[in-house]
Amino acid sequence: YFIENSNEEELIILLKKYIYDDLIRQFEDMLNSRRLQLHISENANDKFIELIDKISYTQILTLCNRVAVFFSDKVLTGNMSKSMAKNAALLNVSKFYDRAIQSDWTINHAEICHIGKELQFFIERILNKKTTILKDIASAENLRKWKNLEKDYNRQTAYAEE
């Protein structure tokens, strides 16, 4: 009912909100496992949100992991304080992205393992999709593509049954 009465923009806004919430939670977990904390400044948060329009959830997760490891190594070697790492971690996710683009590097996709319940529910129950859509950028264009893929799959299944 919800998906039938919502337009694409509303669905994408909600999907991006759930993606953002889940990525922040996972990034905090990555940092906490390395005895670091996350401070979310307005500027860093805005840049992080912009990434959701540029690359996929799984690619952002890869960048978050790289930043967590990098900052953990810096703190362990004494090249950075914990408070500096706390304040700079989120902004550095977008800086790592910028560096990757400038250097023409490919950003790999992280494994989809521990998706938050809210994000998983929204994708599987509201959008009626598989969580593998997280390998694509959350956009209205991709939402239409996912719908068309489902129609094509249903058509192929109908032909196979005949």
Residues of each region from the PLM?
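Basic, alpha-helical nucleic-acid-binding regions used in initiation and control of genome expression
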Residues: Y1-E162
